[in-house]
Amino acid sequence: MGYNIIAVSNQPAELEAVAASLRTEYAIEAHAIYADLAERSAAKMLFDRCQSEGWEVEILISNAGMLLFSTLTNTAPERLATIIDLHCTTTTLLCRYFGEAMKQRGKGRILIMSSSTAWLPYPTISHYSATKAYLKNFAFALWYELHRYGVSVTALFPGAVNTPFYKLSDKMRSRLSSLGVLMRPEAVAKRGISAMMRGKRRLTPGLFTRLVVVICAILPARVLDIIIRIKPIRELLERI
């Protein structure tokens, strides 16, 4: 018998389909809640809904995200606000509400989806990587605040994941997947859940991703700038 699921999304058709599939395949309760998590009121609404329904949330997974390839000066301010609220504000408030309930019960698990870009200077998504750096530091600090009360906090730092986020041809997807640049979402999810259940503080899945993070950390900024200006590398960065 697995965990019952509360799934939240702003895509109602896909949300209902996923919930129905979970009920059928795993014989669990799967509740679908339509919400725009970029709204600042969303976290409180979800917490209040769970309270009113009597749903005790043992595991909180903050995974909602959006990606927009655009330099900062070419990005509309409204889009910047949406990304910041979705990644930073809502995650923080969800952890505030549900984290307090977990603390009072003396048990719980939180998984926060950051990104390998939290460690990297990534041109064309400076706004995105900055929000992921916030989540990195937030998750690390929150672990210190909650682990003594029986609540674990795990931060996940995947690289590029093979999802519709990236507008790639089938040939390019296949090539990047074979090189380990693109990871299967199922593999990332499985490793993230495993790390969370073992109480790990952090996980960067994938050898390629770990190597990139280490290399970028030790290279001088001027050298890294020269490398990312090389045309094939620049074009690849703009696509993944």
Where are these regions (language model features)?
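Conserved glycine-rich Rossmann-like NAD(P)H-binding loop of the short-chain dehydrogenase/reductase
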Residues: 3-17
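The beta1-alpha1 cofactor-binding region of Rossmann-like NAD(H)/NADP(H)-dependent oxidoreductases
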Residues: 12-13, 34-45, 77
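Conserved NAD(P)H cofactor-binding loop of Rossmann-fold oxidoreductase domains
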Residues: 63-68
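Substrate-binding pocket helix/loop in short-chain dehydrogenase/reductase
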Residues: 71-72, 76-84
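Active-site helix of classical SDR
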Residues: 95, 131
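Residue(s) in the substrate-gating loop at a strand-loop-helix junction
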Residues: 115
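SDR active-site lid
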Residues: 144-208, 236
